[in-house]
């Protein structure tokens, strides 16, 4: 646990509770003021109908109505402040839970589980309690997908030189973001209640782009006529107050405006409403996201590039937000009548929509892509901020495999982890023996998970780690599939076949195997394991293999330049003592019979 950071999170929660309480008190005052001002406005309209020569009451009613709209606007802004503060409070509450080891409040990414993936299934990258769940703070499905792709080996598609530059830029970007906790929390708060559905946004944008609006709505002459109409309407109101024109002129003019707006837009307003309303719950998150990024100054090259790719997004999403607000204003019959009478609202909505469509249609995909990458980087930066004991890895350019780690440990174990030193050289094989529960499988996963972190520019759980770029393949968690008639042993063979097919002569690879051929008898397993390792050792492959077969360790005697024995030793006395420390040589003690005797006694 990062005690300093945990204290900061709890302090923020206390402050936000007080802020929310104050804002809710204001909200109650605004509601009462709205009811009162609207009632007064209606009262003056009633007076106009019952008094003689009382056109002045319409002017007062109009002024009070404007006051009502002003108070309503303040109330809306106050409600948004309450929602923002509540979302930020939820962000800090989740981070406090993370600090105490409760990861259930974060998405586990179970939809990304792939048993046939080269390494993610074996290394617990996705699923409950996974690496993804510990890192993921994304507020959009696009950001979540990008993060999942990154942890799944996205780096393997890049040439080494380009990848090294990419890692360097990402380390710089993550470091800068991690140093700005308020920005990270504000960013995460935009999707705290409900994540942005990027696929739905893309689909909605597709519908918007496909919508055909008559060009005359964008004609300058049409716009001038609309403005002239409204100027004349409001002029008639003031003239009627001074008894220069009949009092009923503005009333009939307002009715005319209502029917004019309805006639001009009845074919299109519904289509625009349906298309934009699909974005209603999503676009506000993008507006806030783009606003935060636009206001923030960055020095990291990767962040500056993403910000540049979002250029214009704030204006675009802001215009959509304003269109949505106008649609909200016509969400009931009273709103439709009032806003069309006084402002030709429906015509304004269609005109603004057409202008947005013409201006921003070609580049929305670029904005969504940049937002998704930035979203994933915020998650990575939060991970770096929370894990203050983790260190930056050094990724080197090498034609072969190189993996040197000092005091490396598994990130899931926290303070109770036992740290180990381990070096892996190109085209060499490391046979690890040891008793059950001695730490072999955990150590294999330690190597794999920290490599994934290093390739993504994330801090690793070691005092020092120096690693080259290579392809990773694991075989640790084979499962049968009776639905498709695949037995456990057959599944193992298919996995090994997949491993062999993944190898490329010009691409260095590491294979991490936990018990080759577990689904057969001991002698057959030993012979098969030897056959496989002798075959694979002729390829451009480096391997780390955990096994209970002590006989397999004799490969070092036969080829000491290629095979090396390591072990996790235990101590047997009145009980079993596990050191979880790796050392040279073959394991001497086993514990299966010892533990079974304890059960049977």
What are these model-derived regions, one by one?
Residues 1-435, 443-471, 494-495:
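Alpha-helical coupling/stalk and coiled-coil linker elements that connect catalytic or binding modules
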Residues 245, 380-383, 387-601:
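ATPase nucleotide-binding head domains, primarily ABC-like/P-loop NTPase cores
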């Amino acid at each position: 646990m990062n005690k300093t950071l945990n204290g900061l999170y709890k302090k923020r929660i206390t402050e936000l509770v007080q802020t929310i309480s104050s804002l809710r008190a204001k909200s109650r005052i605004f509601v009462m003021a709205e009811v009162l001002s609207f009632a007064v406005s209606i009262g003056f309209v009633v007076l106009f109908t019952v008094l003689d020569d009382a056109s002045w009451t319409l002017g007062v009613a109009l002024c009070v109505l404007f006051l009502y709209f002003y108070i309503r606007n303040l109330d809306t802004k106050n409600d948004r402040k309450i929602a923002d503060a509540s979302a930020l409070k939820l962000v800090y509450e989740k981070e406090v839970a993370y600090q105490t080891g409760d990861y259930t409040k974060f998405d586990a990414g179970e939809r990304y589980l792939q048993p046939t993936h080269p390494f993610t299934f074996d290394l617990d990258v996705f699923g409950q309690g996974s690496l993804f769940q510990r890192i993921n703070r994304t507020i959009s499905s696009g950001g979540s997908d990008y993060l999942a792709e990154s942890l799944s080996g996205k780096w393997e598609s890049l040439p080494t030189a380009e990848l090294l530059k990419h890692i360097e830029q990402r380390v710089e970007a993550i470091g800068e973001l991690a140093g700005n906790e308020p920005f990270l929390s504000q960013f995460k708060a935009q999707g705290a209640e409900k994540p942005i559905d990027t696929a739905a946004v893309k689909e909605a944008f597709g519908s918007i782009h496909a919508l055909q609006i008559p060009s005359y709505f964008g004609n300058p002459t049409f716009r001038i006529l609309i403005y002239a109409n409204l100027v004349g309407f409001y002029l008639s109101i003031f003239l009627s107050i001074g008894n220069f024109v009949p009092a009923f002129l503005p009333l009939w003019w307002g009715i005319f405006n209502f029917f004019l707006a309805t006639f001009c837009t009845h074919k299109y307003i519904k289509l625009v409403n349906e298309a934009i309303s699909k974005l209603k719950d999503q676009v506000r998150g993008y507006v806030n996201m783009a606003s935060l990024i636009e206001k923030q100054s960055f020095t990291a090259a990767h962040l500056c590039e993403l910000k540049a790719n979002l250029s214009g997004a704030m204006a675009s999403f802001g215009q959509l937000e304003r269109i949505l607000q106008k649609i909200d204003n016509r969400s009931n019959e009273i709103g439709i009548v009032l806003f069309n009478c006084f402002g030709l609202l429906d015509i304004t909505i269609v005109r603004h929509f057409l202008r947005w469509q013409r201006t921003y249609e070609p580049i929305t995909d670029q904005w969504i892509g940049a937002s998704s990458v930035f979203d994933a980087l915020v998650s990575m930066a939060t991970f770096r901020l929370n894990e203050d004991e983790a260190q930056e890895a050094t990724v080197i350019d090498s034609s072969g495999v190189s993996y040197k780690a000092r005091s490396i440990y598994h990130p899931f174990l926290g303070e109770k982890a036992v740290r180990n030193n381990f070096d892996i050289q190109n085209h060499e094989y490391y046979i690890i023996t040891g008793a059950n529960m001695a730490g072999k499988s955990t150590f294999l996963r330690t190597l794999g998970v920290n490599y994934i972190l290093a390739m993504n520019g994330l801090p690793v759980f070691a005092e020092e780690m120096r690693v080259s770029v290579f392809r990773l393949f694991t075989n640790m968690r084979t499962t049968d599939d009776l639905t498709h008639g695949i037995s456990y042993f057959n599944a193992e063979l298919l996995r090994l076949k997949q491993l062999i097919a993944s190898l490329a002569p010009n691409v260095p690879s590491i294979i991490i195997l936990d018990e080759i051929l577990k689904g057969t008898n001991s002698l057959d397993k030993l012979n098969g394991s030897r056959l496989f390792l002798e075959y694979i050792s002729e390829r451009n492959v480096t391997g780390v293999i955990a096994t209970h077969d002590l006989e397999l360790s004799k490969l070092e005697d036969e080829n000491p330049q290629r095979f090396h024995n390591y072990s996790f030793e235990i101590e047997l006395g009145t009980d079993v003592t596990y050191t979880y420390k790796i050392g040279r040589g073959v394991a001497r003690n086993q514990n299966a019979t010892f533990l079974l005797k304890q059960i049977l006694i």
